[in-house]
Amino acid sequence: TELVAQAAASGDLSQAQAVFERGRLIAVHCTSQRAEGVGGSQSARLSVDHPAVREHLATLGRALDWHGALVLDYLYDRAEAQPYYIEANPRLVEPMNAVLSGVNLADILAQLSLGRSFAAEPLRVGRFGVRSHSLAATLLGQADGGASRRDLLRLIGQAATRRGVFADSAEDLTPARLDPPSL
């Protein structure tokens, strides 16, 4: 059995979602975690600008001649402007923050799959500073972490009054005002 040891890394849990066309990066969106869901996932996100990550993605996609979606999870050290990569996956993950930021990654991926070429178009990057959340994922994360019923009710109250992590933030998985049955 072989073991791999590495130094601990610190930083903001972040994620980059990208779409490539035959090795060329055509759309990218980065977020950092504002609240934790089950298993440490991002249940609330803030769109961020991580130029080094965009550059690394472009290099990786070109080297692999990647075609389709790719997601990188990483820790981002703000002081050093340095990402520390955790994993990569060939899919999109909860892309609503990207949509709210002006880049519909799922639509771009669908159009690419149907044969549309984006070769003549500039790289699409979402606006920075857009906040989104999933109340359900946040509640599940808090419950999994041992939060009491009172704590969970307090969190629901914050969501209803748009305070705390829910202030200036859009619901991305169950938007009750737009889709009441989603609750």
What is the predicted function of each stretch?
Residues 1-39, 45-56, 75-76, 82-85:
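Phosphate-binding site of ATP-dependent enzymes
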Residues 4, 69-71, 119-125:
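Flexible, glycine/charged-enriched surface loops at secondary-structure junctions
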Residues 50-53, 67, 102:
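Hydrophobic alpha-helical segments and helix-packing faces
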Residues 60:
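Catalytic core of tubulin tyrosine ligase-like
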Residues 101-112:
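C-terminal, active-site-flanking charged/polar segments
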